[in-house]
Amino acid sequence: MKQTRTAARQSRHQRIRRKVKGTSDRPRLAVFRSHQHIYAQVIDDTRHHTLVAASSLEPELRQKLGKGSTCAASIAVGRLIAERAKAAGIERVVFDRGGNIYHGRVKALADAAREGGLDF
């Protein structure tokens, strides 16, 4: 029986998570992409604690962008997560694409986070 798209993404994400772990020295930058929005979190997996978060749902971004499902929204979220991470003293992260293909909105967020100063 064929898996649904969501189930296939979740199984890919579990496979990735077995290898990608965030530490306090190098936390994990986790990306979740829904149909309408994109979310990013910097997570310390040893303490199970979210250090920094940003999404296209935030009021300041929603006013500027309108739709949260575009590459422009992903770029804005990537810049915002990098800015917040730098303010929290985080410079190096491990990228977790969340089972999504590294293309389009996920790639745009990653590139913007790199341009913002995060190293991964």
From Swiss-Prot:
Pfam assignment, any one: Ribosomal_L18p
GO biological process, one term: translation
Record Gene3D superfamilies: 3.30.420.100
Lineage top rank: taxon: Bacteria
InterPro entries per record: Ribosomal_uL18_bac-type (IPR004389), Ribosomal_uL18_bac/euk (IPR005484)
GO cellular component, one term: cytosolic large ribosomal subunit
GO MF annotations in UniProt: 5S rRNA binding; structural constituent of ribosome
Keyword annotations of the record: Ribonucleoprotein, Ribosomal protein, RNA-binding, rRNA-binding
Region annotated Disordered, chain positions: 1-25
Compositionally skewed regions (Basic residues) per UniProt: 10-21
Task performed by this protein: This is one of the proteins that bind and probably mediate the attachment of the 5S RNA into the large ribosomal subunit, where it forms part of the central protuberance.
Stated family: Belongs to the universal ribosomal protein uL18 family.
Subunit structure comment from the entry: Part of the 50S ribosomal subunit; part of the 5S rRNA/L5/L18/L25 subcomplex. Contacts the 5S and 23S rRNAs.
PANTHER family: 39S RIBOSOMAL PROTEIN L18, MITOCHONDRIAL, LARGE RIBOSOMAL SUBUNIT PROTEIN UL18M
UniProt name for this protein: Large ribosomal subunit protein uL18
